Regions:
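Iron-sulfur cluster-binding electron-transfer modules in prokaryotic oxidoreductases
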Residues: 1-203
Length: 203
């Protein structure tokens, strides 16, 4: 929210403070896992742009991984734990703008394709919420209009699950789906892709 509101000084101050606190873990070889694409983008790219001379920020940036990216890397290098099972329904997967901005490919889709026999529909468009912008009363209807193509595509897939790496985008898509005609029921909640993987493990 501070970045969206243009408070770059506070964002830079936070970057320096957090990066300094995380440096011992980074130096110990720990990966820093971001659960949402916006956080990963901030740590990887936006903080280094705001404080380019700070070595702690540079180190944190290099150590940061999006959680889906991290799981895919583990699957490729070490393999995943046994026990993945097919799901009881298909998944409409939204790829958030901040995932695409990281230039790491469709890591959430790649991760979900590790699930046996998965029926996966990938939606690669803006959901319309725009961070905190789309949840305000004055912008909400406009945000729904922007996200209508995504909501329509998600509704037309008639998949049991809707997933997005961005919690705000997932909730926004469901709100849009409620306004789009369709025979299949709208899911009660949107899941993070990692939650879908957990379901496939029976968790």
């Amino acid at each position: 929210p501070q970045l969206e509101q243009g408070d770059l000084a506070r964002v830079a101050e936070t970057a320096v403070k957090v990066a300094a606190e995380m440096r011992p873990y980074v130096d110990a070889g720990k990966a820093v896992i971001a659960l949402t694409p916006s956080c990963a983008l901030m740590l990887k790219f936006e903080w280094p742009l705001l404080v380019p001379e700070d070595d702690n920020v540079k180190a944190l940036s290099a150590a940061t991984r999006d959680i889906d990216e991290y799981i895919v890397d583990i699957a490729k290098t070490e393999g995943l734990a046994e026990g993945l099972r097919s799901l009881d329904g298909g998944v409409a997967l939204h790829l958030p703008c901040h995932s695409r901005a990281q230039n790491i490919g469709q890591k959430s889709a790649e991760m979900l394709r590790l699930i046996p026999d998965i029926e996966l529909t990938v939606i690669e468009r803006c959901s319309g919420h725009g961070g905190s912008w789309g949840v305000t009363k004055e912008n909400f209807e406009t945000a729904l209009k922007v996200g209508k193509p995504v909501a329509r595509q998600a509704r037309q897939t008639e998949q049991k699950y809707v997933a997005s790496g961005c919690p705000l985008a997932g909730a926004h898509i469901l709100q849009g789906m409620e306004r789009v005609d369709g025979e299949a029921p709208v899911p009660e909640t949107a899941n993070h892709p990692i939650e879908i993987l957990a379901k496939a493990y029976g968790l």
